[in-house]
């Protein structure tokens, strides 16, 4: 009999989540015969994504899931299939999925997204440069923002896992790309390593003025991971027929009250500006094409990615908190066993 390790949500976080919001639990792995469309997975990699913090809140009308108190924490995970009643994911295959902070996980693949990992790719790569955040950036830019060569594209959270990929795709498509990040070190990385045209340190002064100075011809596409004051500053600089891509609102994830949205709404009306949110799941049928194109860009050296890989199932809550402190460098992943590095 296997022992299943898991982290459950003990209480609703108030502000940034802390270790005491969670409880470690071990139990004997017992489950009845799998129902049709279910898989049993041994998880080896856990993605620290900011949106998990939303799921820890009480149910609301925001359309995202709410984790029940006493239930395992929802998360994006990667692992190997041990049992299956879904022909798409046979025993021995590897998958990424919406699972839980559990070592062993039973998932209904008809309800939660499950994606096969191709041979030749380890689980780190599947969760990093070809993972959920990177693919989200791809569709946010190409399907929602739709930048044209020569346009100016502004990206908030540009040094983060999703923002850094979005910014590079903008460059690949021929845009002048400006990234917003916190601190000179991250701004230098955006310019010197990723090849962005300019970077703005949002801590270094009036952001509306900084955007105006750095984007003298205005902003055509704004890829937003942050919301709040940064979104407002971008709206003040958006061009006619501009597009605002709402990918995340990390400025408000730890707030007890909703962060105020844009106030200059008539600029949207008179500027024919479009603001749109989206989910990766909206483009499920287009994933093969996206993976092929991104793999080509990576091979050509046009798309770079960095992963911040940590270890230890017991450390998951502590490591997860770093995503909001900005102390991670790249996509923050937690590896719990060596199967994470297998390519078959």
Role assignments for model-derived ranges:
Residues 229-303, 337-344:
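Glycine-rich phosphate-binding loop and adjacent beta-alpha segment
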Residues 30-48, 56-101:
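Glycine-rich beta-strand-centered segment in the early N-terminal region that forms part
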Residues 2-4, 302-309, 317-344:
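C-terminal capping/lid region of NAD(P)-dependent oxidoreductase domains
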Residues 96, 154, 200, 222-223:
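N-terminal Rossmann-like NAD(P) cofactor-binding module of classical short-chain dehydrogenase/reductase
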Residues 206-216:
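Short amphipathic alpha-helix with an adjacent loop that forms part of the alpha/beta core around
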Residues 127-205:
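Mid-domain Rossmann-like dinucleotide-binding core that forms the NAD(H)/NADP(H) cofactor-binding site
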Residues 102-103, 182-190, 207, 259-265:
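Short, glycine/polar-rich helix-capping loops at beta-to-alpha or helix-loop-helix junctions
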Residues 73-80, 88-157, 302:
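NAD(P)H dinucleotide-binding glycine-rich loop of Rossmann-like/cofactor-binding domains
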């Amino acid at each position: 009999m296997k022992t299943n390790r898991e982290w459950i949500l003990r209480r609703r976080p108030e502000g940034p989540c802390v270790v005491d919001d969670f409880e470690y639990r071990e139990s004997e792995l017992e489950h009845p015969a799998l129902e049709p469309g279910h898989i049993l997975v041994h998880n080896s990699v856990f993605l620290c994504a900011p949106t998990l913090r939303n799921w820890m809140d009480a149910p609301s009308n925001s359309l995202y899931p709410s984790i029940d108190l006493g239930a395992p924490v929802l998360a994006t995970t990667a692992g190997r299939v041990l049992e299956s009643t879904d022909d798409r994911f046979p025993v021995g295959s590897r998958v990424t999925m919406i699972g839980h902070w559990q070592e062993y996980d039973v998932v209904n693949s008809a309800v939660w997204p499950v994606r096969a990992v191709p041979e030749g790719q380890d689980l780190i790569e599947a969760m990093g440069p070809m993972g959920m955040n990177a693919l989200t950036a791809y569709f946010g830019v190409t399907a929602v923002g739709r930048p044209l060569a020569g346009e100016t594209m502004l990206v908030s959270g540009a040094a983060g896992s999703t923002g850094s990929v979005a910014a590079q795709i903008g460059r690949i498509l021929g845009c002048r790309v400006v990234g917003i990040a916190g601190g000179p070190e991250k701004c230098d990385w955006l310019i010197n390593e990723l090849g962005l045209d300019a970077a703005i340190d949002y801590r270094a002064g009036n952001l509306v003025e900084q955007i105006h100075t750095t984007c003298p011809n205005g902003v055509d596409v704004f890829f937003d991971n942050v919301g709040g004051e940064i979104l407002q500053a971008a709206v003040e600089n958006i061009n006619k027929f501009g597009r605002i891509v709402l990918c995340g609102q990390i400025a408000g994830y730890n707030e007890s009250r909703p962060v105020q949205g844009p106030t200059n709404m008539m600029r949207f009306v008179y500027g024919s500006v479009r603001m749109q949110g989206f989910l990766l799941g909206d483009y499920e049928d287009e994933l093969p094409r996206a993976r092929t194109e991104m793999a080509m860009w990576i091979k050509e050296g046009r798309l770079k990615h960095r992963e911040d890989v940590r270890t230890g199932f017991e450390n998951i809550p502590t490591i997860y908190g770093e995503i909001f402190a900005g102390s991670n460098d790249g996509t923050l992943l937690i590896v719990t066993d060596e199967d994470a590095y297998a390519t078959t």
